[in-house]
Amino acid sequence: ARFVVAKANGASILLAPGCCQSVAKRAVTFKGTYGEGEAARTQPLTFSFDRPLNKKPFQILAHRGGGRTSDLLPASENSVEIIQLAERLGATGVEIDIRQTKDGTFIIYHDINLNLRLTQKTGLVGAIESYTYDQLSVFVRLFNGEKIPTLIESLDVILNQTALETVWLDSKDVRDMPRLRTIQQTYLQRAAQQGHRLNIYIGLPAQEQVTQFEQLPNHRQLPSICELDTSVAKRINATVWAPRWTLGQQIPSTVAMQQQGRKVFVWTLDVPEFIQQFIQNGSFDGILSNYVPSVAYYHYVQK
């Protein structure tokens, strides 16, 4: 598709100093044409300005760095390349899966094992923690040819090449929680120095990770996301409570958490009808999804 805004259809408004503070309804019109598939662009299409987008603060969180490999995106899940695409898909933040290699390097990878679902065929088999990072870097490529990234590489890209606001570090297999905390604090400090508004949360999906987290000094002051029940979120002073969407909207619990100063993100919500319902409810602070364009659409058009 291709669209043009003529001077008479609002181009002068868009180019004026101080544009867009108070644009009248239908004062700006995009006119153009589109085609189906490889066909020529011959079908007319017009978009006219109706009202401003919803400005309510809300986190649109991309699962696995931007989306799943199985959804045939142009980059593999949990890759640096998909993180770089996340904003174009509508995300304001990303969730990435944290594991450690045999030599302790933090990497981004979802599954326990190397497999053909996530990687190209290789001679390596079995648990990813059985290999050093150098071995994985040399011999393994993700489904679309990318390297398995380290956590450091991923955070460098997020901080220096995107405007993403939220990073959810989903602790799939973390044997060194103190070092993960150090990395979190280092990048929070760098973001503050660069003027990049960025929240980095240590995700706690199960009791094992909560136990590790509680052993950290001053853990109650660390930014964290708790997927367990509200009593655990309160005990560890989690910054965010994150229930799964299949438990329902849980409005009383959500309101109680927010009254305690916590945010509430729901996961992993992919069905458009339910995305619309959860956004129209208006209680949540963010949604984690494999389909962030749908979340972005329903959020921004919400009145």
For the regions a language model picked out, list residue spans one by one.
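Phosphate-group recognition and catalysis centered on beta-loop-alpha active-site segments
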Residues: 1-303
